[in-house]
């Protein structure tokens, strides 16, 4: 039985939304990867996924690496999405042979995450104007990202009832809907409390209509702050502080690296970051070792 690519992809995406409960961002990434796969199938004249061979799939990976100009990590993610599609088709009884079983993903060269110095982190935070509504908000966001190790998506979706400033902790909803309660630093707690008292009520008052947002961080119109806007806040603070190449994830990297430099156990840091594998967290230990080598060489 023929398995048309378009119908198969549609069915698979509906499956991951309904059955797996994946986040909107994750599903959107799957869709982009599989759109790329469908475009290649159109180019080579293949529509029946049941007839796709491992050799043809290897051609797709080569095309993605060479002609589509994707990085090794993007190719790996795309292959993972295609592999998920074929596993779904096999589970549904639509194919008898999975062409992805004998296909390996390209290896990714180890790229160490960038960590800011404490001095640069402070400079970014202090670049926010403490006398304006947005400056107070921006400082709270920066302090929270660095003081909790939260992902940017976790920060902008955080609700007021998830915060416990008395115990200085927050309940974060991470990838796959997994929840974890993590402590937040005293500076972050104070900055968020100042924002909740001095800035958020005034921003909320600017809301014209619609639902009252439960999210902690708001935009100038009183609505929930978007990921893109939060990214812009971090980038603007870095520019004001003269710190190049900074993203929200850089603050998360810095949180982890500084904890490990202070002697924290790698598995504790793994729990705080909400990472499923300690191997991912151990990358940060390489950063701290490299830094120790630099200090030793300079002494």
Task: Enumerate the language-model features and the residues they cover.
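Conserved catalytic core of the tyrosine transesterase superfamily
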Residues: 1-299
